[in-house]
Each structure stands twice: as C-alpha cells, then as structure tokens.
Amino acid sequence: MADYWKSQPKKFCDYCKCWIADNRPSVEFHERGKNHKENVARRISEIKQKSLDKAKEEEKASKEFAAMEAAALKAYQEDLKRLGLPLPSDISEPTVSPVISTVQPTPTSNQQKEKKKKKKKKEASKGGWVEGVTADGHCYYYDLITGASQWEKPEGFQGNLKKTAAKAVWVEGLSEDGYTYYYNTETGESKWEKPEDFIPHGGDVLSSKDSGKLPDTLEDAKSSDSHSDSEGEQKKAGEASTETKKLIIKFKEKNKSTEKRIGPEIQKEKSTPKQNPSNTNEEKPKTLKKSTNPYGEWQEIKQEAESQEEVDLELPSTEGECLSTSEAGVGEIKVVFKEKTVSSLGVAADGVAPVFKKRRLENGKSRNLRQRGDDE
C-alpha cells in the first residue's frame, strides 16, 4: 500500500482574521492571547455602538412620524371646523410608540420632563381650555393658547367657561321662482340638492313650511328682503344667535317689462274674490312643477363686426430698398450674343483638305500612362 500525505485541519478566527490549527491546544492558546482579547472587546463595542445608533434613528423617525400625524390631524380638524362639519368620534391624538433603548436616562432629562408636566398643569389650571359642542351634540375641548383640541377632558379643567356652539354652515333659501336651494355662508357655494351636513333649525323655515304660501308678489319679496336686512344689522350689533335665518338670494334681476306684467296681475288678484282653498292648493303645485335649468338659459351670441382700424406699427421705411417682383421682371437685362465668322482656314483655303495626325507613342505605349522610372 502506498503512503500518502494528509494535511492538518485549519480554523479561521473571525476576530483576528487569521488561520490556526483546528485542535484544542492551538485554539485555547490563541484565545488566551492578548491580541485576540483586544479584537473581541473591539468587536463587542462596535456592535453596541451600532445598536445604540439604530435605536436613536428609530426613536427620531417615530417622533417625526408622530409630529407629521399630529400636524395632519390638526389641519384636518381645522378644515372640519371651517366647513362646519361634525368631528368624527374615532379621531384620537397620535401617540408616539416607545422605543426600547439601552441608554439609561440621565437625571437632568427626568427633571426637564417633570418641569414640562408642571407647566402643562399650570396652563390648564389658568383656564386655557374651553368646552365646545359640535353640530351632532358631542362635547370637545379646545385650548385657546396652543390651538389644540381633544375629546378627553383635560386635567385641571374648571368647567366654568362658556360653551361654544357650532354654527350651521348651510342655510335654506328660496329663489324667485319659489324653488328651495341651499347656501353655504362660509364658502359662498349654492346648490339645489340638500347637503348631507345640513342642520335644520326652527328659524330656518320661513316660506312654505310656516305660512303655506310662496312669495308670488313683489311685496312679499320686498318684506322678506327688509326682514333679512334687519337680521343682518342685529348680527353686526353683536346679538349672536345660534339659529340661522333663511336667506332669499336673487339670481337674476327682472326687467322693467316683467315688472309691468306683474303689476296688472297683482291688481287682478286683488279685485277677484278669493276662491276655494282647494283650488288654490291645486294651483300651487303647478307653479312648482315649472321646469328649471340649473345651468341657465341659452343665449344667442351676436358676433360684432370688428372695425379694421389702421394701426401704426412704427416700422422702418422701405422706400427704394427693395423692388417688387413685377418691377424686377419688367426691368430684366437681355444678353446679346455676338456671332463671329471665320474667313479663311489656312491650308484648307489653298485647296488642300485638313489632315488629322495621330499621336506618336513612345515604345508602343500611350503618353498619359504612368511610366516606371529608373529607380523603381
């Protein structure tokens, strides 16, 4: 049997980046060495530092996300308040998820947190929070100093402040034709359909629901206009009321011809005796069934003839600089070719016909071909 050589097994030390013999005495001897211990301690410190940095980054990111959520929630609540929409009950303040860190907090940071808590309690005790009621009847709390709002009752809230009632944004109104529309007092928007967040009040219904009659005459419209003007003056004087009055907005002004037509109709109605209430009730729905176009009526556009006025463009004068094509064509110069006649042909004149001579070739080769020189 032939002899063969077998190598000893090797082991790679990840801390020292070197190869050692894979046996127990060699491994123990290497691990007891000073260089190996220093490398192990250095690796442990690096891992610890990386974990701390990662924890700090996660904490910073969580704080940034919480701040973004708080800002978005605040803007959303402000939009709801501006539009007069009820605040949903499932909205809660964003909470920062705690991040576990191996660094122990210093006593100075604890003192700062305690000071901040005391300041918040003092601000709450001073009466910065105000209790309000939404359109749905839910209570919320609003901070006049910081502008924050929350559903939970804050600490130190006294409860002796005035409650701020949410105002109804949409108001019901009547057009000149007797149709009901809805007007937004904040944005100025008007629509025919009843909005979802419309809040009916006792003072809103002023037309057909209370009196049972539509403003068919101009006198009723004028009285309603004066009534709305007096209400506007009362609001400006400071007599705030939670009930919003119905507004009557004129979409278009009537011409004098329509006013003249309405005049004799009013006189006829006054002169004629009152009919049975059943007949009047039958006539009212007919007037309401009048077809209305929310986009307005078609108008014919008349194109006005534009007056062609000569406008001075202050261009430079072009007199004598360029000629028109017609003038250039007329003034073209004609080229005259001269004819020359040959009187005599030399030898041919003496009665001898001309002879064409051939070229002489040197050594039987044409002259125009390149000849090889002596050097080549």
Curated annotation (Swiss-Prot):
It holds the Pfam family WW. The modification Phosphoserine is found at residues 228, 230. Signal peptide: none annotated. Its main location: nucleus. Residues 123-156, 164-197 form the WW domain. Residues 94-127, 192-324 are annotated as: Disordered. Residues 94-111 have a biased composition (Polar residues). Residues 357-375 are annotated as: Interaction with SNRNP200. The keyword Zinc applies. Residues 219-272 have a biased composition (Basic and acidic residues). Involved in pre-mRNA splicing as a component of the spliceosome. May play a role in cross-intron bridging of U1 and U2 snRNPs in the mammalian A complex. The WW domain recognizes the proline, glycine and methionine-rich (PGM) motif present in the splicing factors, as well as the Arg/Gly-rich-flanked Pro-rich domains found in several WW domain-binding proteins. Component of the spliceosome B complex. Associated with U2 snRNPs. Binds splicing factors SNRPB, SNRPC and SF1. Interacts via the WW domains with the Pro-rich domains of KHDRBS1/SAM68. Interacts via the WW domains with the Pro-rich domains of WBP11. Interacts with SNRNP200. This is WW domain-binding protein 4.
